[in-house]
Design a protein with these regions (language model features):
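A structural signal for well-ordered alpha-helices, especially hydrophobic packing surfaces
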Residues: 22, 60-63
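Short, charge-rich amphipathic interface segments used for partner binding and complex assembly
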Residues: 31-61
Length: 63
């Protein structure tokens, strides 16, 4: 499977996962960053984890 195919197939799921992680920010407060890091570490394959990480950056960066 090509990188483009993988990205296309996983993009929606990566966005949902990033939104799920971001939704916990208010609940976890200052512990959120460490929690997110451990959640990202558990994602597989690494290419998918990178997609979720990029989506988190997009969702949290000011416009």
């Amino acid at each position: 499977m090509s990188r483009a195919d993988f990205h296309q197939q996983q993009a929606e799921q990566a966005t949902r996962e990033a939104q799920r992680l971001l939704a916990q920010q208010a609940t976890l407060g200052p512990r959120w960053l460490g929690w997110v890091a451990s959640e990202l570490y558990q994602l597989s394959p690494p290419e998918y984890a990178a997609m979720v990480r990029r989506e988190l950056q997009r969702l949290t960066s000011p416009d």
